[in-house]
Amino acid sequence: MSFQHREIEKKWQDYWLTHKTFATSDSEDKPKFYALDMFPYPSGAGLHVGHPEGYTATDILSRMKRMQGYDVLHPMGWDAFGLPAEQYALDTGNDPAVFTEENINNFRRQIQSLGFSYDWDREINTTDPNYYKWTQWIFLKLYEKGLAYIDEVPVNWCPALGTVLANEEVIDGKSERGGHPVERRPMKQWMLKITAYADRLLEDLEDIDWPESIKDMQRNWIGRSEGAHVHFEIEGHDEQFTVFTTRPDTLFGATYAVLAPEHALVEKITTATQKEAVEAYIKEIQSKSDLERTDLAKTKTGIFTGAYAVNPLNGEKMPIWIADYVLATYGTGAIMAVPAHDERDYEFAKTFDLPIKAVVEGGDIEEEAYTGDGKHINSDFLDGLGKEEAIEKVIAWLEEHQKGEKKVTYRLRDWLFSRQRYWGEPIPIIHWEDGTSSAVSEEDLPLILPKTTEIKPSGTGESPLANIKDWVEVVDPVTGKKGRRETNTMPQWAGSCWYFLRYIDPHNSEELASPEKLKKWLPVDVYIGGAEHAVLHLLYARFWHKFLYDIGVVPTKEPFMKLFNQGMILGENNEKMSKSKGNVVNPDDIVESHGADTLRLYEMFMGPLDASIAWSETGLDGARRFLDRVWRLFTNEDGTISDKVTEQTGGALERSYHETVMKVTDHYEGLRFNTGISQLMVFINDAYKADTLPKEYAEGFVKLLSPIAPHLAEELWNKLGHEGSISYEAWPQYDESKLVDDEVEIVVQLNGKVKAKLTVPADATKEQLEDLAKSDARVKEQLEGKTIRKVIAVPGKLVNIVAN
């Protein structure tokens, strides 16, 4: 007989919502546990089976911690601004707010149907003005501290669409919508100075419990490099440019320089004879993305400007080229080329027949660049020195002659924070006619995103907000000065940078969150989500958190103490699930056919939480069969509690039960849910073999099952005679003394060969073991006619008799 999952699951979901079972307490007398999921973007497609994997993991921890006496904060919300809703609005003419609300309602319904123990009174939505008021407030604080500024940055401009495109909207130099040509064009953009926090973002990784692979991704993204800035004069011009190099010791081997085509000096220094070729080259590369430009496998392209730099060490002339593999947004936008000792420079020099001069001993530069270490040669006062010594000496020379200085740089660039979009948080800045800018006052926040039917490109590179004149154009009531509101909006990252803080105090209209509540709940104890957010989201959230720490808003330096990335659930064919492949599994279908508890159990039992594993209908059926076995063990045909469940204690299941409590608790704590479930299965197998199931063990088992299969557990808990929910019952304890076997199995060897296995008292002495072995019928038979020479007894293990 199987249980009626539709009826039972609806009954308990209604109960939890009505009774606010999972409402968070802010009491001071309990330890706290904050379990956070990466909140979803509410897409039109709805939830897929990949979402519940991480959500079930945090839910298991949350349910267990409540039963262990913790105050648990386990919230859910919506990362609801973003490009898809805007594209939908452009395609249909419908309001993205309405579309978003419909999607959120669908997501909420789906999530509630899976029985997660969220506190729905704390639900947040990044598009709610009461939420983005505080996103705007954080921006104003960054602006006040000089960490938000405007800069000219190359962007993807599509002339045909009259709009700026995100990198993911550009495919092979053309717009995803309509296939129109896209070019790189400099535009004024808001930037956030994340580089000011680079060292702290790097150093504080040591203090948090994150997978080492994720920490390495963050370290590589930040990319700290020690080296030198070298200043190059330009022959015949009163100009100079600066390059950063980690190998200033190879400066004697620098034979040419390369500037990014967008570098500010290119126009000034290009000679008349080269002007046409340089302009043609710049036009040609305008449609290339940064990724295409820096592709190592592509053929090197470039153009000579006609100008020469002067090598500061030896005064030699170095031709200045431009090439697309040097980016204006990376480093200083200029490099010194040492082709003898750098593969990319070598390839470029060979392509354009530029001089190659070896300055480090080793290798054969006729064949390839030598990138190893060695003594310096052809380097004047550096000759004979090793790398480290030569670097120190050349930096000292550069500093003494004011031709350069020691420098630490970062791969990390400041964060481009503006989007030419409608569906995002308005940036609370006004630009005045006299060229000044000022922030919207805090009292006037939130600056509401205006409703409009004109969600179409402005044609000027500004966002569609530029079309709404009565919103954009303002007059200072005091001075009468005219101004225009900032028309760019914030990126989707903005709302997700700090959402975990708002869950702590979601209805506070006076401040981002109360300091007392932030002190109680921070940092987040466990954060579970997909590895695709391992770099940018986590880096941006850490940056904002550190900034808020600096201005006294939050009490911790880091937001997330423990981070875990769940793996991906693949289609049955081991391919990534996607609509185009037709292999997407909808959780609604599984909840209907097998039940939410089955889906939760199956996704946790598939394998390790961080592994990527293929979906299997057979595995899903197996998970349901296990829950049916539990139901049949606990209940009679008429639905009453089984006669097998008795009031007696101890008995045959004693050791199995205590071992199950110990192992399941340990495995849940360690996020090893698959092995925890295996142990639950072991106990059920043992319970079927036993004549009776002590009620104490039945209740303990139901508690252990409840984080995984909460609906079934609630129903069984009621059938065991309890009122209300199991959610706050005490988590089972195990007795270590019950884990020790009274008896153990030992082997008996004759001349080193196993002849028998005996079950003996666990505390038997050597003498007792010897007597037991000698008196065993099989051993006696083997010893007949032999003389015992020696007996070796090892308690708990073996007896070896030497005889001949």
Swiss-Prot record:
Q: What Pfam families is this protein classified in?
A: Anticodon_1, tRNA-synt_1, tRNA-synt_1_2, tRNA-synt_1g
The protein's predominant localisation is: cytoplasm
Residues spanned by motif 'KMSKS' region: 576-580
Instruction: State the EC number(s).
Output: 6.1.1.4
Residues that hold ATP according to the record: K579
Superkingdom of origin organism: Bacteria
Biological process terms in GO annotation: leucyl-tRNA aminoacylation
| Cross-referenced PROSITE patterns | AA_TRNA_LIGASE_I
Question: Where found, per UniProt?
Answer: Cytoplasm
Segments carrying motif 'HIGH' region: 40-51
Write out the GO cellular component annotations: cytosol
Enzyme class, UniProt record, top EC level: ligase
Gene3D superfamilies membership = 3.10.20.590, HUPs, Isoleucyl-tRNA Synthetase, Domain 1
Keywords (alphabetical) are: Aminoacyl-tRNA synthetase, ATP-binding, Cytoplasm, Ligase, Nucleotide-binding, Protein biosynthesis
Q: Which Gene Ontology molecular-function terms are recorded?
A: aminoacyl-tRNA deacylase activity; ATP binding; leucine-tRNA ligase activity
Instruction: List the catalytic activities from the record.
Output: tRNA(Leu) + L-leucine + ATP = L-leucyl-tRNA(Leu) + AMP + diphosphate
Family label: Belongs to the class-I aminoacyl-tRNA synthetase family.
| Stated name of the protein | Leucine--tRNA ligase
What organism does the record attribute this protein to? Bacillus pumilus (strain SAFR-032)
- Gene that produces this protein: leuS
